Amino acid sequence: MKKALIIGGGGFIGSNITQFLLENRDYSIDVIDNFSRSVGGKTPILEKYRDSERLKILNLDLTKLENFDQLNRDYDYVFMLAAMVGVDKVNAVPHEVIRVNSMLLLNTLEWLKASSCGRVVF
């Protein structure tokens, strides 16, 4: 069984990749998200599979590098899909959007550098 990490897995693309891999491939999947855009901290697609033994969902803020310590370091695939998005958000707090998105990318790259992960998809 292959292992995948989906950073930003609570969003539209991430949750659909999760669904596809669970339904069509033999993968164990860790989904990481802060779920700031979901209703009540839940994403319908992820809720459908919450009890799957092949799915682990973590609510983490990856702008803090130490939170990466909770992850494995040997995923076959890493999907980096996390970002603060939305025109309203960008217009309201542009500096915060840049800070958060920069830290997400920087911390992910630092963690990948110290890991033995296979392929990375951005």
Predicted features along the sequence, with ranges:
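Conserved Rossmann-fold NAD(P)-dependent oxidoreductase catalytic core, especially the SDR/UDP-sugar
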Residues: 106-122
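Short alpha-helical oligomerization interface
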Residues: 87-104
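Conserved NAD(P)H cofactor-binding loop of Rossmann-fold oxidoreductase domains
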Residues: 81-85
